[in-house]
Amino acid sequence: MWLDAIDLALSRLAALSAPTLPLGNKGPAGQQHGTVFWKAGAAERLKDLGGLGPKDTLVEALAGCFARRDCPIWADSSTTRECHNLEEALGGPKAVAEATGSAAYCRFSGNQISRIARREPEAYASCERVSLVSSFVTSLLAGRYCSIDASDASGMNLMDIRSRDWHEGALAAAKADGLREKLGRVCPSYECQGKVSPFFSTK
């Protein structure tokens, strides 16, 4: 759906035939706590976007690039078990809040990822990268996986708010193999992630 929406927005912009204006920095935003699970091999397909033509679509170019069809978003309460696991591992609700900046909330991305790893082990194992919605759109624009920034990572129950890096105890509590690698690094919110892929500039 998100790829469809971006394709539609690009086609409507092209149809306007308005004068092209120079753009400076671009910073996408997305639904809070939503996660996208990229399938193994998707990184190469992202790189290949730069070689596509203006009539190609993201839906076609990235078909089969996702380990799950659906992406959990904030409107969810299915992760009570995972929240309890996190609280038990870190020493209770107060300890979770002191470590990650928030109590263990069902809608938070870390608990969603933990549930998917438990209930859909094959899908999780086939995933090479987990993005938040904001870093997903940034990755599309850049044609490569981009980092989750600290402000968004603070709403995952996974980041140590003092070091602004992934919290080892929270990662372990998620019981999701290789989660640190799948998440990539946490970056400062002001960091430039790269240049826009030629795929978008030709649109």
Describe the predicted segments one by one.
Residues 6-203:
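Glycine-rich phosphate-binding/catalytic subdomain of phosphoryl-transfer
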Residues 1-5:
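N-terminal helical capping/dimerization or prosegment-like subdomains
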